[in-house]
Curated annotation (Swiss-Prot):
Lineage: Bacteria, Pseudomonadati, Pseudomonadota, Alphaproteobacteria, Hyphomicrobiales
GO cellular component, one term: TAT protein transport complex
Domain of life from the UniProt record: Bacteria
Annotated source species: Nitrobacter hamburgensis (strain DSM 10229 / NCIMB 13809 / X14)
Gene: tatA
Record's keyword terms, sorted: Cell inner membrane, Cell membrane, Membrane, Protein transport, Translocation, Transmembrane, Transmembrane helix, Transport
Composition skew (Basic and acidic residues), residue ranges: 43-60
Single biological process term from Gene Ontology: protein transport by the Tat complex
Protein's name in the database: Sec-independent protein translocase protein TatA
Length: 79
């Protein structure tokens, strides 16, 4: 009585088919498959962006900084 026999499973499947119908179950499975595909695609996109290295930035010490013009000509300096 505690274990489920094959007849119990047949009755359960028959009730599910009667409640949902074949069309709804196939639509549901299609939606699940689309969700899994979208999830896998999102995971692949995340891996691609993580693998892409950031460009190396260099500093040119000889070039003056933009907007940093020196205007100390003619200014008074105190010692």
């Amino acid at each position: 009585m505690g274990s489920l026999s094959i007849w119990h499973w047949i009755v359960v499947i028959a009730v599910i088919l009667l409640l949902f119908g074949r069309g709804k179950i196939s639509d549901l499975m299609g939606d699940v498959a689309q969700g899994i595909k979208a999830f896998k695609k999102g995971m692949q996109d995340d891996e691609k962006t993580a693998e892409k290295p950031e460009p190396v930035k260099t500093i040119d010490h000889n070039a003056p900084a933009p907007g940093a013009s020196r205007s100390d000509v003619g200014s008074k300096t105190t010692v």
